[in-house]
Amino acid sequence: MKITGVEIRPGNIIEFEGGIWKVTKIQHTQPGKGGAYMQVEAKNLIDGRKLNNRFRSADTVEKVRLDTKDFQYLYAEGDDLVFMDKDTYEQITIGKDVVGEAHEFLQDGMDVVLELWEERPISVELPEQIEATIVEADAVVKGQTASSSYKPAILDNGVRVMVPPHITSGTRIVVNVYDREYVRRAD
């Protein structure tokens, strides 16, 4: 579907100059002379390059719709991750760079959603929150109040998070995958 330069919004996936780009930021600019334009920042979903481009109202770009499919994470193999299609049981191998830093939160058997463009994986969506066990937590410092102080802890997947003082090693907690913050104790 073609859209004009002024219809571009953050989060849109567009095809431009032979690449697939996810729009991260836009700014509408109306200079004193000349026509208005949209200043667009975008990230290439294939190789991670950044784009900074001006689109005038007369310019058109192709808005891309990605297909989504349910997969299950199986295991890591070096710098690659192996997923299984939940419908066909077919396995697919994807580089860790496609998942980004969130790959540290992948757990065997975890259900994820893959975004595909022309049958090629572009990104992986993990659940927003996961459960993990704390393997190491600093001791509580006397005199700290529970309301404002947090202490560092290391999860069973090696990720460091800040947790409240009452949380100790061996405790199962819920962590937000994308901002790496403690949410609550696991039930």
Swiss-Prot record:
InterPro entries: Elong-fact-P_C, NA-bd_OB-fold, Rib_uL2_dom2, Transl_elong_fac_P/YeiP, Transl_elong_KOW-like, Transl_elong_P/YeiP_cen, Transl_elong_P/YeiP_CS, Transl_elongation_fac_P
Pathway assignment: Protein biosynthesis; polypeptide chain elongation
Keywords attached to this entry: Cytoplasm, Elongation factor, Protein biosynthesis
Molecular function per GO: translation elongation factor activity
CDD domains named among the record's database cross-references: S1_EF-P_repeat_1 (cd04470), S1_EF-P_repeat_2 (cd05794)
Record gene name: efp
Role played: Involved in peptide bond synthesis. Stimulates efficient translation and peptide-bond synthesis on native or reconstituted 70S ribosomes in vitro. Probably functions indirectly by altering the affinity of the ribosome for aminoacyl-tRNA, thus increasing their reactivity as acceptors for peptidyl transferase.
Official protein name in the record: Elongation factor P
Pfam families: EFP (PF01132), EFP_N (PF08207), Elong-fact-P_C (PF09285)
Lineage: Bacteria, Pseudomonadati, Pseudomonadota, Alphaproteobacteria, Sphingomonadales
Cellular compartment(s): Cytoplasm
Record has Signal as a keyword: no
PROSITE patterns reported in the protein's UniProt record: EFP (PS01275)
